[in-house]
Amino acid sequence: MFNISIFHSTWTFGLPVMECWSWRLTRSTRGGAIATLGCTGLGYGKEDKQGPVKEGAGDWLNTLFFEEYGMEGSHMLGEAWAGAITSYLNQFPVDYTRRAFDDTALDAKTVQEWVLLGDPSLKIGGYE
């Protein structure tokens, strides 16, 4: 793809991309994944938060997914994904009255971009 941008932004590392990493893994013509979880854009980490409490963001959400599966007993992919999103928003509620670059906006962006690509009715680990 021809790069027509005049600024090399650190947000995209100066390279526009046509698809997210999760979709790339799923659509692979050499036998893609049956499902993927991941960010559709620039994923944030707790280090990107500005407030005194450095918790949340993508690494927190990933941990919540495995907590849903391993500790809460969510064995269906969509159920574990939805539970992780719900748990994250209960811990980090979004305040839509705040500025766009506050931590609450980062939390909103985190859950909006963390998508499940694939069949949500898949059982994690398969059937016996």
Language-model-derived ranges and their functions:
Residues 9-128:
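Active-site-proximal C-terminal subdomain of hydrolase catalytic domains
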